[in-house]
């Protein structure tokens, strides 16, 4: 498959350094890669190795990981290690309808929208206009706006939708949305709450237990890379540790 005008490609060098480039025909200077004329990529095969300056660079289609790294940030974002748990534990798939509380910089929205495409949708509630404007720029840059509907509303005041597959909350007070989430979810649907503090988890779980939710669980994901070389293998000294706690539950008819 060849690269075409207006494609988005990711450049990856031998050390794993990467950047995303819009093949718009423009020339730009990119830190670590030098001056790049994106028009020169048109017609090249994906996976091809080229030389930029003195380094070898490969041209590939961007993965979700690459899109994540390219996002500008206005608020703390949910990282891939936590987003993956949300996707799997809530069984979010192509065609899913997901209500999101708190869009922030749009990082989780970006990944969820790629998962639910082309027939699903992310309905994101956000009460701050500055976050909405910022997130929309990110979503537009990674071309997923077609799968996202944004409502400038406080989700603690209610959710319009019914029979949705999942409700995902990244707000300071998720316990104030639990009843609204139960009303919005289909039977068997899932709720996921991202909370940096354990005190938030406790209040959220207490509210979940008051309603017909079961399979209530809270997890924390820690990520550590392994350094593999010719002379031996060891864990990296740097570990991506605590970012937040994830609380999950499923809606039932009665308890």
What feature does the model see in each segment?
Residues 105-118:
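Conserved SAM-binding loop of SAM-dependent methyltransferases across substrates and taxa
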Residues 93, 116-117, 144, 185-187:
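Helix-to-beta-strand junctions that scaffold the AdoMet/dcAdoMet cofactor pocket
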Residues 70-84:
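Conserved SAM-binding loop and adjacent beta-strand
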Residues 1-61:
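N-terminal auxiliary segments of SAM/dcSAM-dependent transferases
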Residues 125-174:
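S-adenosyl-L-methionine
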Residues 93-104:
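Conserved class I S-adenosyl-L-methionine
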Residues 118-123, 191:
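Short beta-strand element of Class I
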Residues 175-245:
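C-terminal substrate-binding/active-site "lid" region of AdoMet-derived donor-dependent transferases
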């Amino acid at each position: 498959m060849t690269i075409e005008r207006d494609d988005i490609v990711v450049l990856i060098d031998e050390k794993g350094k990467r950047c995303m480039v819009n093949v718009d025909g423009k020339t730009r200077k990119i830190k670590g890669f030098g001056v790049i004329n994106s028009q020169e990529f048109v017609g090249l095969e994906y996976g091809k190795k080229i030389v930029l300056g003195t380094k070898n660079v490969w041209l590939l289609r961007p993965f979700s990981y690459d899109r994540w790294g390219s996002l500008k940030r206005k608020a703390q974002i949910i990282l891939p290690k936590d987003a993956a748990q949300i996707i799997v534990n809530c069984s979010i798939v192509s065609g899913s309808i997901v209500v999101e509380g708190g869009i922030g910089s749009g990082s989780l929205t970006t990944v969820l929208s790629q998962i639910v495409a082309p027939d699903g949708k992310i309905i994101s509630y956000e009460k701050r206009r500055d976050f909405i404007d910022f997130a929309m720029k990110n979503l537009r840059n990674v071309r997923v706006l077609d799968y996202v509907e944004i409502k400038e509303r406080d989700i603690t005041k209610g959710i319009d939708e019914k029979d949705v597959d999942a409700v995902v909350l990244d707000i300071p007070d998720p316990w104030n949305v639990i009843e609204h989430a139960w009303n919005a979810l289909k039977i068997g649907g899932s709720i996921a709450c991202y909370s940096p503090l354990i005190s938030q988890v406790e209040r959220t779980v207490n509210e979940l237990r008051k309603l017909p939710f079961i399979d209530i669980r809270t997890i924390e994901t820690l990520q550590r890379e392994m350094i593999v070389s010719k002379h031996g293998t060891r864990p990296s000294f740097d570990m991506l540790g605590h970012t937040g706690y994830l609380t999950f539950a499923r809606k039932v008819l009665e308890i």
